């Protein structure tokens, strides 16, 4: 998410440890732009479920604990949809939500496609290869193509596998 937000003009930091009023909190992403400082919670699911009220309440409680560190708004990013209860609660307490097709015409898929960013998770690759690519900072298909075969071999892929992954990433990009 940090890389996506950077493409949209945000300055970001990931996995930031902040001492809250009550306990130490790890913030998934801290994003800043135009004088706003967001505490972002990333909720990603491998199976098509929704992000619900519990996650929204949990995020807001964490925000209240660390608000004194200059955070202006909590923000939840998810690769799924939000439940109606989560939307209602978020609207009431001021949580920004970004998910699949939400907000309308500003959902995560719009943010990605508007910058030509296609996550490597859409490639047909096994988990081990995916994990290696992510560890190397290659999270978008264009990163894989730009890195080239030599870089993919450096991170542990065979020459054949590297060429296959690059070819598939090129097809996705178009």
Curated annotation (Swiss-Prot):
Sample GO molecular function, one term: DNA binding
CDD domains cross-referenced by the UniProt entry: Af1548-like
Entry protein name: Uncharacterized protein AF_1548
SUPFAM superfamilies recorded: Rad51 N-terminal domain-like, Restriction endonuclease-like
Cross-referenced Gene3D superfamilies: 3.40.1350.10, 5' to 3' exonuclease, C-terminal subdomain
Example GO biological process: DNA restriction-modification system
Pfam families (alphabetical): AF1548-like_C (PF22357), Mrr_cat (PF04471)
Cross-referenced InterPro entries: AF1548-like_C, DNA_repair_Rad51/TF_NusA_a-hlx, Restrct_endonuc-II-like, Restrct_endonuc_IV_Mrr, tRNA_endonuc-like_dom_sf
């Amino acid at each position: 998410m940090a890389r996506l937000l950077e493409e949209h003009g945000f300055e970001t930091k990931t996995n930031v440890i902040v001492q809250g009023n009550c306990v130490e909190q790890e913030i998934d992403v801290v994003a800043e732009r135009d004088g706003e400082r967001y505490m972002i919670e990333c909720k990603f699911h491998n199976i098509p479920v929704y992000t619900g009220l519990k996650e929204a309440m949990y995020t807001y409680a964490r925000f209240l604990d660390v608000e004194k560190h200059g955070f202006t708004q909590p923000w939840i990013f998810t690769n799924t949809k939000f439940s109606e209860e989560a939307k209602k609660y978020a609207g009431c307490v001021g949580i920004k939500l970004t998910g699949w097709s939400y907000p309308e015409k500003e959902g995560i898929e719009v943010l990605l496609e508007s910058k030509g960013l296609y996550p490597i998770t859409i490639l047909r690759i096994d988990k081990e290869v995916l994990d290696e690519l992510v560890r190397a900072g290659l999270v978008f298909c264009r990163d894989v193509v730009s890195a080239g075969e030599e870089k993919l071999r450096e991170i542990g892929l065979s020459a054949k596998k590297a060429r296959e992954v690059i070819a598939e990433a090129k097809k996705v990009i178009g």
